Amino acid sequence: MATDVVPTAKLYEEHCASCHGAGRLGGIGPALLPENLGRLKREEAVAIIRDGRIASQMPGFRDKLSTEQITQLTGLCYAPLPQVPRWELADIRGSHVAHVKLGEKLSDKPVFKADLLNLFVVVEVGDHHATLLDGDRFVPILRFATRFALHGGPKFSPDGRYVYFGSRDGWVSKFDIYNLKYVAEIRAGINMRNIAVSSDGRYVLAGNYLPHTLVVLDASDLAPIKIIPVQDDAGKSSRVSAVYDAAPRRSFIAALKDIPEVWEIPYDAKAEPIYPGLVHDYRLGEALAAKGPFPVRRIRLDDYLDDFFFDQSYEHLIGAARNGKNGQVVSLIVGRKIADVDLPGLPHLGSGITWDYRGTPVLATPNLKEGTITVIDMKTWKTIKQIKTLGPGFFMRSHEDTPYAWADAMMSPASKDAIQVIDKRTLEPVRTLKPAPGKTAAHTEFTRDGKYALVSVWEMDGALVVYDAATLKEIKRLPMKKPSGKYNVYNKITRSSGTSH
């Protein structure tokens, strides 16, 4: 037995630790513990190590590891730690970092000149930095260090002054754009998925893979307010897939990984009471309303939702499971599934966008597994068209003031360098752009007015390439270190239909 343990540990250190953490607690990749692998069967884990995983861009190791070695590593992933790390309120409070001294007053006027609503925050994952970019002149204002492995996209305060970052290893950071400096940081978890900022600017919600919690923070200084354990009525806990702000509903939405539920968490003090059980008549006292701030409304479903998308009203969410064959449409008004949606392959709903097509609102979503973009009528929830593309893609973006939608094929080995421009009026591709032939091109974002589109060359020696959104000609190119995403202040805080929220 002893001779078995040592080589397995060395295999993990050599092939896995750089992404999944030295103690299997997560890093760029998720934590590899039995508590976090509840839905994954061992034979499926073997296949993932051998062949890779499309959705997470994890490579396969069939050429580097033998069948026996893959089996060894699988066994390690399912082996419990002597003690599962805890991250409780005292730990969160103890991690707090205040970058603004007590009594220090930050200026309410920006220390630079630019259109404050046409700024971009560009995340450069190559060396863990971010660049604040002037969206009129396409000139960097400041490049600054971030925490390790940011994930989920930065989120802005409602006025666009502050940007909040979330990292894979649990850190939440608040940065003052006006003063070009960090305000505060705190570690909300050990392995975190993403964060959301409330529409009133008062709260930040962090969703964790490890521990299985949601953490509510005060947006002003990131002080912890509440930890919400994530578990069903039977006590089964779950990782959090993602958290979102449903601004028109003044609530947070949490997608859960291991239990078939979606949670709605109101942050409005005037919200209607939430009754956990079945209530026929509240006067009879059949159920008591959940007490305290941030009550949980559980929406129970037939299947898991790993990935989902909201309509512009935030009355419906469209979700899909990674191993499912169809999507589900869930009404947040009535709290249940109201329709099934035909979504073959592996749709990436988190990158879906909407627009008006011949008088009908439509949803378009790329696919991580197939070279298709699915276009769905959002009145009937029927598929209008499957647009054939050059290969599986991750991101799709547009803007209200452009007739085009831009889609990458970054999951395709043969076409990873291509961006396809699709006419929203005809649902047909009209142009293919290759910002850097042979290098990965991904993640388009538009300027505030929709006149320019910014595309990432997603490599260590990468670049941000600016295109005229009408002529599709290159305007400018800025060298950057693997710019994974760029986020326009105005488009984000106004919840543009052409970008993710």
Question: What are these model-derived regions, one by one?
Answer:
Residues 12:
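Short metal-coordination and nucleic-acid-contact micro-motifs, chiefly zinc-binding Cys/His arrays
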Residues 1-6, 22, 45-51, 65, ...:
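Predominantly soluble domains enriched in secretory-pathway, periplasmic, or organellar proteins
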